Amino acid sequence: MSEFKVKTGLAQMLKGGVIMDVVTPEQAIIAERAGACAVMALERIPADMRKSGQVCRMSDPRMIKEIMEAVSIPVMAKVRIGHFVEAQILEELQVDYIDESEVLTPADWTHHIEKHNFKVPFVCGAKDLGEALRRINEGAAMIRTKGEAGTGDVSEAVKHITKIKAEIQQYKENLKTESDFAAKATELRVPVDLLKTTLSEGKLPVVNFAAGGVATPADAALLMQLGCEGVFVGSGIFKSSDPEKLACAIVEATTHYDNPAKLLQISSDLGDLMGGISIQSINEAGGKNGARLSEIGW
């Protein structure tokens, strides 16, 4: 079995689960108790990064290690786009997965990390099919929608998963000849075989999670019904008034996403949820609510 197959197999093991952002071992324990399939170790959640206006880098390895020691579920950590040395450090630390993330300040505005050079599986964000296939070609073992992290507004995540699905369907219908496939692969900057495999299967060849703006059980169920295979939850849980109850509810909603009666029960009495920031209040140049993080990446 190829090393890439091993890495994609590890990512498949998270399918149907919820991955939660945590900033302390105590939060990681809450996430594990609530049923999270993994945690993302961070010094600051995306909502706080967005407010700071500062350069956001890989978290302190000591903090990540403390979280790794506190829980038995897999631990992920983020690196800046293109910062392969941060990735080398996290691989040496033996994190379970690395997220090459647009939430952090990019280190390289031209190249993403060549992920085939690492044994640890990588997660990457994508807002359309071309981005997703370019990241997979670089070695990403899992794709997630970019959404708009730190907002509590799920609309961008919905847009991204919908676009990826629509493009797959459109290309399946319209690409008929070898020259059609070759032209589209050139346009997307991906190998033609990867494009053909994706269209033949009708889905990405790696697991595809939702991320960015998930704040409620209904948000999680919505994205699962739209075709996502699991959910990342960032700022939403620990910006709420009852994090453990909300965490449990989002895990349940991700499992029972097609059961309205169960979702009704899950969604009741959750306390005050994350206030959030509407996408319309954010512009690409930035401002008091930060810039559009989903536009970072190429």
Swiss-Prot record:
SUPFAM superfamilies: Ribulose-phoshate binding barrel
E.C. numbers: 4.3.3.6
Keywords: Lyase, Pyridoxal phosphate, Schiff base
CDD domains, sorted: pdxS (cd04727)
Pathway: Cofactor biosynthesis; pyridoxal 5'-phosphate biosynthesis
Pfam family, one: SOR_SNZ
Binding site for D-ribose 5-phosphate: 21, 150, 213, 234-235
GO molecular function, one term: amine-lyase activity
BP term (GO), one: amino acid metabolic process
Catalysed reaction, written as an equation: aldehydo-D-ribose 5-phosphate + D-glyceraldehyde 3-phosphate + L-glutamine = pyridoxal 5'-phosphate + L-glutamate + phosphate + 3 H2O + H(+)
Induction pattern: By the absence of external thiamine.
Gene3D superfamilies found in the cross-reference section: Aldolase class I
Family listed: Belongs to the PdxS/SNZ family.
Complexes and interactors: Homohexamer. Interacts with THI11.
NCBIfam families: PRK04180.1, pyridoxal 5'-phosphate synthase lyase subunit PdxS
Protein's name according to its UniProt entry: Probable pyridoxal 5'-phosphate synthase subunit SNZ2
Originating organism: Saccharomyces cerevisiae (strain ATCC 204508 / S288c)
